[in-house]
């Protein structure tokens, strides 16, 4: 999500392990996150989450509440685990996520029509206006 006072959420993004070995935990370990050969082996894909509108709305409301509760500003990524039963668990609030082009945060913004250059301009602008309360 992005913003200081006025918050905007981007498309929920998910990490999928397409070839998860049987019995292996569905957890993003450091090896899974940072080892390209292992990512290839287990079929790691990141993409827009396949959620119904009701769940997306619920996640957006929860995200805004958490963002404000933690006094976040500028931009942040909130990582969740959503159960098959629809329960939502916050795993991490990351106030400084990777913002490189073609990484999850930038891809989620692109999915909402915000290209990379515009995303960076928005982040810079929010930082410059932070102290003024804009």
Residue ranges and their predicted role:
Residues 1-61, 84-89:
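Phosphate-binding site of ATP-dependent enzymes
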Residues 50-134:
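ATP-dependent carboxylate activation and anion-phosphoryl transfer catalytic cores
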């Amino acid at each position: 999500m992005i913003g200081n006072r006025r918050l905007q959420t981007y498309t929920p993004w998910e990490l999928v392990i397409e070839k998860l070995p049987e019995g292996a935990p569905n957890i993003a370990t450091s090896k899974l996150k940072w080892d390209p050969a292992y990512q290839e082996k287990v079929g790691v894909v990141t993409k827009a989450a396949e959620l119904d509108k009701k769940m997306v709305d619920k996640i957006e409301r929860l995200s805004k509440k958490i963002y404000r509760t933690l006094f976040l500003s500028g931009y942040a990524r909130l990582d969740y685990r959503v159960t098959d039963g629809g329960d939502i668990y916050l795993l991490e609030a990351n106030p400084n996520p990777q913002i490189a082009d073609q990484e999850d945060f930038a891809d989620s913004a692109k999915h909402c029509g915000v290209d990379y250059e515009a995303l960076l301009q928005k982040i810079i602008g929010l930082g410059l206006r932070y102290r003024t309360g804009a």
